[in-house]
Amino acid sequence: ILQLISLILLPQQKKSYYLMGTYSYIEMPSADLNKKAYKILHDIETKLSDYIDSSEVSRINANAGKNFLKVSSITMEMIKKAIEVSEKSFGYFDITIGALTINAKRLKKIDEFRAKELVNFKDILIKGDSVMLKRENMAIDPGGIGKGFAIEMCYKKLNSKKGFISIGGDMKIWGHKRTIAVRDPRNGTSLVQMVNSKDVSISTSGNYLRKHIETPEDDVLQVTVAHEDGGFADAYSTAIFAMPEKMRRKFIEDNPDVGVLIVYKDGSIFINKRFMEFFEILLFKTNSEKQRRKN
């Protein structure tokens, strides 16, 4: 998980909030921008949260197999972005995992075997500004994309020259340089310290962080993605973590715009060239741990 270490001192307003089921941190040049950022994020949460019965996502789920539901441009953009990631990730990211995570595991409406049969992003039907899930008991779970997507939407709506937003394992830095760290998932210490060289969105996934991820049995502990877009960073980190190793490497090769840092159980790491392009400094905890690098 990512952790704030330090910041070049500039006039700013900092505040922590509880958003989207976790703690968030917003840092803006003024108190007004800070309040505006929170309001935008809260508004997005009321549309996308599957824990809010009146949200657009919850209403889509309630109408699965029955009716089309007219949705806002925000919800539509999130769904379309999720479908795009599903297509690029060979289906290892699938927002309709909600049949399993929501309807089977949380609400106990159906059994897990039936739920897995209902997971298929191709059964999301879009007609104009309306959405419907093709089969009853299908469900959208925005957990693998929602936080990063919300941060990105907030960044676009704020029109602020600089800022920092962090929600759980997702963050975006723009208009300034900042020292951040990737924690070692085995002991919570700092594994890599980094200073960004450009605006960047960062997302970290691991099954200890994100219970909505169905994972293969391999030696990956954690995946951190750096990308220009927060929604893509969030969804790609989810997808890459869920993939088996052979498919993971193919995806990374086929998508050079996605920066990837992978932590393995033996302490080794994998970093691709794109990840390093987002940072002017990368400092590793020790030289004793075996490292895997790809340039």
Regions found by a protein language model. Give the residues of each.
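Bacterial N-terminal signal peptides
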Residues: 1-6
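Mature catalytic core of soluble alpha/beta enzymes
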Residues: 7-295
